[in-house]
Amino acid sequence: DTGADHHAGCVHFEPLVGESGLGSLLGSGITARESGYDFRLAHALRSVPRRAGEATPATATVREPRSAPGKISLRAMTHLLWQQAGIDRWVPAMQGKRNWGVLRYRLSECARLNHPNTAPLADILLMAKPFKESEAAGHAAARATFLASCTQPDRDGVSRKVIVLGELKSATPVDSGDVRVLLKHMSEQPFLADQKIWKRVQKVYRPLLKAKAVDDMLRLVVTAIVSAQTERVYRIDALSLILTTENWIPVESAAEAELIRALVAAGRSFYKPLAFASNPAMFPGAVLRDSGPKRFNLEVISAFEDEKTGKLRMASIKDRGSKWIWTLGEAMPPLPPRIVPPRSPQPVVG
């Protein structure tokens, strides 16, 4: 693969593996194949019946801060799909064209190439088709059939779990004591999270939830592993959230969202390095692809970061030698001029 050697504005350009969190997982949690990836999730994808007298397993987990060696989190899997599908990138021609239907198609194509825990991801991944009134009943019936067929126990009582991915619509307490989680385009099918797991969600993802609470244009994308409790009652066993802009570009904070929106408004071409399992402070806020043959890092700093994160970010910026740094609250520095690449760009070595 020579994509990283191409002119940054070339259609064949690909970021270096080490420019995102994928680099730290290749060979340890993710194995690259010719046309996709194999990986092991840190969560089981099968439910095994308990023997008589066996203790009830611990409550579901939101996400593991540090996955076991050789395994990856749901967040890392979601970032992998986003990067494979090219949703971490932006060019002005995408304006107004990147909707849930396009996103779902690209993610579905990537799911066919990946194998979590040796199973084809496409066989257990549920993403709702875009809502259309005339087709809503048929789509809902198809989802119900898919969930039932995937989670039906076999002769030994072992049943598969399903990975559900979609934009969060609402999360509300219900009389059972659970929290009912609804996803857009499939609100007829609730997924239940017990209060303990949802309190953990609120703790782990508090910055993302707060960012969404004050900016309705941002999106929260849920990736969850669900299992059948009874007929049509599906419980969340593990859950991860990522925050994205209205154009589905992942961001780690409101500060990054401001940078991404400024770039989109300026008509720039760029990509957003995704953290996977790494600390997001290790990566630039965005990387321009239209300012010359080389990548151009854009850094954004917020005064509201904790001291540890701030020190890591500043050390990473120094290591990269970045020249463009925007401190929020101050005027954004001028962006480097846009440079149109040659019609037949040559590989750039070094």
Region spans (language model):
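Intrinsically disordered, low-complexity linker/tail regions enriched in polar/charged residues
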Residues: 1-350
